[in-house]
Amino acid sequence: MQQFEEVHSILEKAKKITVLTGAGASTESGIPDFRSANGLYADANVEMYLSRGYYNRSPKEFWKHYKEIFQINTFHQYKPNRGHRFLAELEEQGKDITILTQNIDGLHQLGGSKHVIDLHGTLQTAHCPKCKAGYDLQYMIDHEVPRCEKCNFILNPDVVLYGDTLPQYQNAVKRLYETDVLIVMGTSLKVQPVASFPQIAKREVGATTILVNEELTGQEYNFDYVFQNKIGEFVEGLSSRK
């Protein structure tokens, strides 16, 4: 209980809060953890199907597999959960809060957060590789192979594919160097370069670091506070301190 009280006080006083989220932030909305032992990424071919090279070589086949892997046609059923709303509420209270998410579901934005850096892109949109016109999720659902209405080019998904660089990485690191508090929620911290963020925040910036994850990550030494909880449980614990 004392940890909850201390963290509540830290968040009350913090000027700039950065939150790094992973799959655990969305599993409470019913979205499967694609990287789990039984997840869709367990298929040996998935990395090929979701690669930039495969999109370039076989864009029609790419879209078929992309839709199957991410279950695009049923994605509207997923809604923001208590964790998403909690972060949006912090922002509504006037906190300078930025979310760095590894998730591609767009639920932080749907939950009301305005300052979100999608490290791995988003499933919610795609764009024309020629004219850059944007298209939403419903357009992708409605068209077997989505094409630009103006150029007729097959759309490029806004998810970062294997073989792509992380276009938002530098923006994320810049934010880390400005932050007072880093909260890491629902990620095993196994994927680089994101796995280095807690060390940057604690060792180089001197920020207060907080981990919320059901499983231990092996990086507990980089955190001032460790909560081995579901995110919803953590939020409930903080709420009871008000």
UniProtKB/Swiss-Prot annotation:
GO-annotated molecular function: histone deacetylase activity, NAD-dependent; NAD+ binding; zinc ion binding
Binding site for nicotinamide: 34, 104-105
Keywords: Cytoplasm, Metal-binding, NAD, Transferase, Zinc
Binding-site residues for NAD(+), renumbered to this chain: 23, 27, 34-35, 102, 104-105, 120, 187-188, 213, 231
Catalyses which reaction(s): N(6)-acetyl-L-lysyl-[protein] + NAD(+) + H2O = 2''-O-acetyl-ADP-D-ribose + nicotinamide + L-lysyl-[protein]
Cysteines engaged in disulfide bonds, as pairs: none
Cofactor(s) the protein requires to work: Zn(2+)
Deacetylase sirtuin-type domain boundaries: 1-242
EC number(s) on file: 2.3.1.286
Active-site residues, record numbering mapped to chain: 120 (proton acceptor)
CDD domains linked to this entry: SIR2_Af2
Main location group: cytoplasm
Pfam families: SIR2 (PF02146)
GO cellular component terms given for this protein: cytoplasm
Binding site for Zn(2+): 128, 131, 148, 151
Enzymatic class: transferase
Subcellular location: Cytoplasm
Zinc in keyword set: yes
Co-factor binding comment: Binds 1 zinc ion per subunit.
UniProt family annotation: Belongs to the sirtuin family. Class U subfamily.
Function: NAD-dependent protein deacetylase which modulates the activities of several enzymes which are inactive in their acetylated form.
Name used for this protein in its record: NAD-dependent protein deacetylase
Encoding gene, per UniProt annotation: cobB
